[in-house]
Curated annotation (Swiss-Prot):
Residues 301-336 have a biased composition (Basic and acidic residues). The keyword Zinc-finger does not apply. The keyword Repeat applies. Residues 156-202 form the G-patch domain. This is Protein MOS2. It comes from the Eukaryota. GO terms for biological process: defense response to bacterium; innate immune response-activating signaling pathway; mRNA splicing, via spliceosome. It comes from Arabidopsis thaliana. Residues 231-258, 401-428 form the KOW domain. Required for innate and induced resistance to pathogens such as compatible and incompatible isolates of P.syringae and P.parasitica. Keywords: Nucleus, Plant defense, Repeat. Residues 1-32, 301-340 are annotated as: Disordered.
Length: 462
C-alpha cells in the first residue's frame, strides 16, 4: 500500500518595523538617514524602529467553531400530501417462494469471491484513513521551522516587546484583563556587611538621617546661646553629666575643636577631655537630673550595704582576714599589730570601691589586674576606657564575680589556688559553690575568697 500527500506552502508572518512617524522601516544594519535641513525649533525624531510581531491565529479544533446550517424545505409536493409508491424489486433481490413466515434463522452465505483477508484489509484501511486525516490536519496547523532570517529580523532584547505589541500592548500599559497600570518589577539587591534577615535598607536610611539631624540640632543648641553667642567659653564653670567623669565639676581651659572641651577638675590639677554633649551649666535641668541620678545610685548602694550587715564584701574581707601577730620589742614589752595578707593575683577582675580615690571618677568601675608590683599593690587596666591605673592598693578594691558557670580562682582560705567554675552563688549569705577542674569536686567557699579569672591555667601560680 502506497501513501502520498502534499502540503501547501504557508506564508510566514512578516515582522514589521515601524518608526516613530509610523512608516515601516527595515533595520538591516546598513540603513542610511539623509539630513536635508536643520531646524532648531524641532526635535529629532526617533529613528529606531519599533518591531511588531503579528499574533498567530488560534487554530486549535476549528470544527468546534462550525455551526450546522438549516437546509431549506423542499416545495415540490408540499401541497399534495403523502403518497404511496409501489415497491419495485431490484434485480437479484427477488424473494424466494419457499420463504416461511415467523422466526427464521439466517444462514451465512459463503462467497468465494470475497475472502476474509479482504474484509480485514478494508477495516484496516478505514482506520488508517482516519489517522491520515488527523495527521493532515495537524500538519496544516503546524508552524514552519524558524530560519536565520527570522532571528535576524528582530533583535533578542526587543523580542518580548514586539510580541506583546502584536496583541495591542504599549509601553506603560498593564498586562491582564483588569490591569489599570503597569506593575514595576521588584529588584532584589544583595545584602552586604551586617545586613541580615529582616534588614530594611530604607528604614535604616531614615533612622540614620533622623539621628544625624537630631545630633546636629543638639550640637547647635549646645554651642549657641540665646543672643547668638557661645554658651561654653574658656574659663566657665560646668558640670560633667556623662562619660567616665560624670558628676565632677570643673572649668573649661581649652577648646581644641567644636566637639570637645578640655576641663580642669575642681580641687585637683587633673585635666580631662569631654564632648560637647557631656557638659551642662551649673544650675541647669541637665545638672539636676544628673545629680539626682547619682544620688539614687548612692541610696541603692547604702541599702545594699545595710542588707549585707552594713559592710561591703571588700571591708568584710579585710576585717575577717586580719590576723594578729605579737612580737617582742627590746624593752620586753609586747604589742599587737595587724598584718593583712595579700590576695592579689594577675589576670583577675576587681572593682574599685573607693569614692575618694581619683576624685571618685573610677568608683564602682571594673578592671583587670595586669601586674602585682607589691604585696598589696597592683596595676589595673579599666574595662571601659582601657586606661592603665598604676599603684592601686588592695584596700581600694574588691573581687568581681562572673556569671554562673564562669571561670574563677580561689584567692584565700584552705582552697587557695584552686581554679574552677562558679556553680552557685548566694548573695544574701555571701557563699558560693566552686567546681574544681582538676578533680571535679564541689567546694564551698565565701564569695570574698574568689574572683573572676581572665587568664590561662598555665599562668596560675600555685
Amino acid at each position: 500500500m502506497k501513501l502520498s500527500f502534499s502540503l501547501p506552502s504557508k506564508s510566514k508572518p512578516k515582522v514589521t518595523a515601524t518608526t516613530a512617524d509610523g512608516n515601516n522601516a527595515v533595520d538591516d544594519g546598513t540603513s542610511k538617514e539623509f539630513v536635508t535641513e536643520f531646524d532648531p525649533s524641532k526635535t529629532l525624531a526617533n529613528s529606531i524602529p519599533k518591531y511588531v510581531i503579528p499574533p498567530i491565529e488560534n487554530t486549535w479544533r476549528p470544527h468546534k467553531k462550525m455551526k450546522n446550517l438549516d437546509l431549506p424545505l423542499q416545495s415540490g409536493n408540499a401541497g399534495s400530501g403523502l403518497e404511496f409508491e409501489p415497491e419495485v424489486p431490484l434485480p437479484g433481490t427477488e424473494k424466494p417462494d419457499n420463504i416461511s413466515y415467523g422466526l427464521n434463522l439466517r444462514q451465512k452465505v459463503k462467497d468465494d469471491s470475497i475472502g476474509g483477508d479482504a474484509v480485514e484489509e478494508r477495516k484496516v484501511s478505514m482506520g488508517e484513513q482516519l489517522m491520515l486525516q488527523s495527521l493532515r490536519r495537524d500538519l496544516m496547523s503546524l508552524a514552519d521551522d524558524p530560519t536565520l532570517e527570522d532571528f535576524e529580523s528582530v533583535p533578542v532584547d526587543g523580542f518580548g516587546a514586539a510580541l506583546m505589541a502584536g496583541y495591542g500592548w504599549k509601553p506603560g500599559k498593564g498586562i491582564g484583563k483588569n490591569a489599570k497600570e503597569d506593575v514595576e518589577i521588584k529588584e532584589y539587591k544583595k545584602w552586604t556587611a551586617k545586613e541580615g534577615l529582616g534588614f530594611d535598607p530604607d528604614r535604616s536610611k531614615v533612622v540614620d538621617v533622623k539621628a544625624k539631624v537630631k545630633e546636629s540640632v543638639k550640637l547647635d543648641k549646645k554651642g549657641v546661646g540665646i543672643n547668638g553667642g557661645d554658651v561654653f567659653f574658656v574659663g566657665k564653670e560646668v558640670r560633667i553629666i556623662a562619660g567616665r567623669d560624670v558628676g565632677l565639676k570643673g572649668k573649661i581651659v581649652e577648646k581644641p575643636g567644636s566637639d570637645f572641651f578640655v576641663i580642669k577638675i575642681s580641687g585637683s590639677e587633673e585635666e580631662v577631655k569631654v564632648g560637647v554633649n557631656e557638659v551642662a551649666d551649673l544650675g541647669s535641668k541637665e545638672e539636676e537630673k544628673c545629680l539626682k541620678k547619682l544620688k539614687d545610685l548612692q541610696l541603692n548602694d547604702r541599702e545594699k550595704d545595710k542588707k549585707t550587715s552594713g559592710r561591703g564584701r571588700g571591708a568584710e574581707r579585710g576585717s575577717r582576714s586580719e590576723v594578729r601577730a605579737s612580737e617582742k620589742q627590746d624593752r620586753g614589752q609586747t604589742r599587737e599589730r595587724k598584718v593583712k595578707p595579700s590576695w592579689l593575683r594577675s589576670h583577675i577582675k576587681v572593682r574599685i570601691v573607693s569614692k575618694d580615690w581619683k576624685g571618685g571618677r573610677l568608683y564602682l568601675k571594673k578592671g583587670k589586674v595586669v601586674d602585682v608590683v607589691g604585696p598589696t599593690t597592683c596595676d589595673i587596666t579599666m574595662d571601659e576606657t582601657q586606661e592603665l591605673v598604676q599603684g592601686v592598693d588592695q584596700e581600694l578594691l574588691e573581687t568581681a564575680l562572673p556569671r554562673r558557670g564562669g571561670p574563677v580562682l580561689v584567692l584565700s582560705g584552705k582552697h587557695k589556688g584552686v581554679y574552677g567554675n562558679l556553680v552557685e552563688k548566694d548573695l544574701d549569705k555571701e557563699t558560693g559553690v566552686v567546681r574544681d577542674l582538676d578533680n571535679h569536686k564541689m567546694l564551698d567557699v565565701r564569695l570574698d575568697q574568689v574572683a573572676e579569672y581572665m587568664g590561662d591555667m598555665d599562668d596560675i601560680e600555685y
